[in-house]
Amino acid sequence: MGARIKFTVGRLRTDRVHHVGEEDVRVVLSRLPDALYQRLRAVHFNDRGRARTFGYVTRGRREIVLCALPPRMGLGRALVHGETPESFGAKRGAKWPRLALRRFMLYDVFLHELGHLQIADAMASSDRLRFAREKLAHEFATEWRHRLWSERFDHEDPVHNRPSADELEKLGAMAGAV
C-alpha cells in the first residue's frame, strides 16, 4: 500500500502548523481500495495556503498538497451542504479542537483532493473535463468518509473514527460553560 507515494514537508513561515502528517495520510490510504489512489504519486505539506486554502491538487493530477493552518480556528464557513462541525467533533461557532481539525483535514480535505484524482470522463478531450471537479470531489469525500466511519476502526488515534458520544457530550458541556 502506498509505499511508492512520496511525502514532502515544506518550511513553515508563520505560526501555522500541519495538523496531519505522513503517518495519518498513510492510515487513511490503507483503509481505501488501491484503485482509488493509484494515480497518487506524492503528498506535500506546505504553507502556501495562507490559512485560506486547505488543500489542492497539482496541475498533473498526481499530487495532493495539504496546507498548514493556524493552531486553533473555527471552520464552520468551510463546511458545505450537509456537513456540520459536530460530524468532525467540533461545536458550531467556536474554535475547533485539534482532533476535529485533524479529522477535517484527513476525512474531508484529503479525501476531497483525492476525489479530484478520480477520472470522471475517460473520453474527455481535456484534463479539465477528464477528472472530477468540485461537485464530484465533494461527493467522493462524503461517500468515503461515511463508508470509513460506518464501522469502528481499531486504531489508537481517535482521528480515524467518527467523534465518539463521549467526545460530543464534552462539547455540549463546554458550550454550557461558556
Regions found by a protein language model. Give the residues of each.
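Hydrophobic (often cysteine-bearing) scaffold residues that line and stabilize catalytic clefts
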Residues: G21, Y107, R133
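Active-site recognition of the HExxH zinc-binding catalytic motif
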Residues: D108-D121, A137
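Long, well-structured alpha-helical subdomains associated
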Residues: G2, K6, G10, H19, ...
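Short pre-active-site segment immediately N-terminal to the catalytic Zn-binding motif
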Residues: P85-F110, M123-L129
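A metal-dependent hydrolase signature that marks the N-terminal structural subdomain at the beginning
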Residues: M1-L79, R92-L99
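Charged, glycine/proline-rich intrinsically disordered loops and linkers
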Residues: G76-A94, E167-G176
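Short conserved catalytic/interaction loops centered on acidic-Pro-aromatic/His motifs
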Residues: D121-E134, R152-E156
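An active-site-proximal "capping" alpha-helix that borders the catalytic cofactor pocket
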Residues: A132-R147
